[in-house]
From Swiss-Prot:
Induction: Imprinted. Promoter methylation of the paternal allele may restrict expression to the maternal allele in leukocytes. One of its GO terms (cellular component) is nucleus. It is found in: Nucleus. Its main location: nucleus. Pfam families: KRAB, zf-C2H2. May be involved in transcriptional regulation. It comes from Homo sapiens. There is a cross-link at K300 (Glycyl lysine isopeptide (Lys-Gly) (interchain with G-Cter in SUMO2)). Residues 14-88 form the KRAB domain. GO terms for molecular function: DNA-binding transcription activator activity, RNA polymerase II-specific; RNA polymerase II cis-regulatory region sequence-specific DNA binding; sequence-specific double-stranded DNA binding; zinc ion binding. The gene is ZNF597. GO terms for biological process: regulation of transcription by RNA polymerase II. This is Zinc finger protein 597. Keywords: DNA-binding, Isopeptide bond, Metal-binding, Nucleus, Repeat, Transcription, Transcription regulation, Ubl conjugation, Zinc, Zinc-finger.
Amino acid sequence: MASMPPTPEAQGPILFEDLAVYFSQEECVTLHPAQRSLSKDGTKESLEDAALMGEEGKPEINQQLSLESMELDELALEKYPIAAPLVPYPEKSSEDGVGNPEAKILSGTPTYKRRVISLLVTIENHTPLVELSEYLGTNTLSEILDSPWEGAKNVYKCPECDQNFSDHSYLVLHQKIHSGEKKHKCGDCGKIFNHRANLRTHRRIHTGEKPYKCAKCSASFRQHSHLSRHMNSHVKEKPYTCSICGRGFMWLPGLAQHQKSHSAENTYESTNCDKHFNEKPNLALPEETFVSGPQYQHTKCMKSFRQSLYPALSEKSHDEDSERCSDDGDNFFSFSKFKPLQCPDCDMTFPCFSELISHQNIHTEERPHKCKTCEESFALDSELACHQKSHMLAEPFKCTVCGKTFKSNLHLITHKRTHIKNTT
């Protein structure tokens, strides 16, 4: 209980000790916040009464009041409620942990919850802060709560590759790599995806759905990134202007590519014909492109083509969904009823001819796009463009076996695995 203040002498002045109510540190901790406020307000009123009486020692009274208020506020800050049951978590035995990923927790290390509960129990038992700091090696409770706990890191261990994770959900995602689990399958082409969102985006190729519509025109797109790229065409400001024809561009690389069309520099001449091209990949077309005269003929309309792929694509123009022009009788695609083009080898569909033609190089194993720096070939022009960026950057990581360089250590480690497989 609170100790009684000393009895004042009848003739002496009224001092702070005559009015103050004293509490021990343990009693202050157990006080309700309203009781601490009442004690502090009562002490303050008593001191104000003493000051009004004109007694000596007013500076000492104010100093004592300030110290008393600070002590109560500090104790109020150090008071923490118990946020979990005061029961220690039992250690999981090896029999109970069979088949349970949580049993992979490192043995001999207390969990974070148990450490916090131990701290709260110590506070509730009114252990002085000095003893508490000596026990945990810190000075204040704020340092205890804010200090990182090394035992909480990498406590979930993968049984396949011994890799550690700090959260069980990360371990579950990682284990799909070993099992090869891909549970989202397309019902049209049979392609499998790891995530439902990727399957939903892929399904738009078959359904022709384009949910992202431009607010300034009637164009629509399957992906939001395509819409964002399209919106740049509506921007009026085009800071880069061609000095020859006055055409404006939003990006400097686009202007540089356009200016090649006005000059004879960096042009490539075909060995099969007299045509010139601004880009070298155009020279890598199949030889049948330059053969004089059409080589492939369609069976229904007797129309001739230079490449064998186009007669198969021409089937789309003879179905019932095509519309006939009233002037000259030619058939055209009805884009309102247009169905995506399907690859005859893998049943994948594409919205336009150019994408399907580029895709065909994957099945024919043709690699017409060749890198000028390292002479590596690629099936798609986009793959070549992505590869050429690697030559622009520094590659400080060098393979000691073949001498090939890489821009990151991760790529070097992945490359070294090919040498290990070849030796085995």
